[in-house]
């Protein structure tokens, strides 16, 4: 179920403060954040975020196409290394 329109998008306060400060100072340094749950708003266009994936920080450059998504959607937390059986079947044939 989608969030109510009257509530607006959720963005952590500390992330929004960093966005406003970066826009005001015209700063191009990436904003380091652990807040994967924050929604991307139009204020964030042109900024780079370092989003934590549980192990390291993944750089995410925000464009117009990212608006409305969450920051965490662009920093995958799992690495898929393939199914064990599929490799063995190819070797056996």
Curated annotation (Swiss-Prot):
Record keywords: Ribonucleoprotein, Ribosomal protein, RNA-binding, rRNA-binding
A biological process from GO: translation
UniProt cross-references to Pfam families, sorted A to Z: Ribosomal_S19
GO cellular component, one term: cytoplasm
InterPro entries xref list: Ribosomal_uS19, Ribosomal_uS19_bac-type, Ribosomal_uS19_CS, Ribosomal_uS19_SF
One term of GO molecular function: structural constituent of ribosome
The keyword Membrane belongs to this UniProt entry's keyword annotation: no
Keyword set includes Ribosomal protein: yes
Function: Protein S19 forms a complex with S13 that binds strongly to the 16S ribosomal RNA.
Alphabetized NCBIfam families for the sequence: rpsS_bact (TIGR01050)
Record-stated family: Belongs to the universal ribosomal protein uS19 family.
Protein name (record): Small ribosomal subunit protein uS19
Organism: Campylobacter jejuni subsp. jejuni serotype O:2 (strain ATCC 700819 / NCTC 11168)
Lineage: Bacteria, Pseudomonadati, Campylobacterota, Epsilonproteobacteria, Campylobacterales
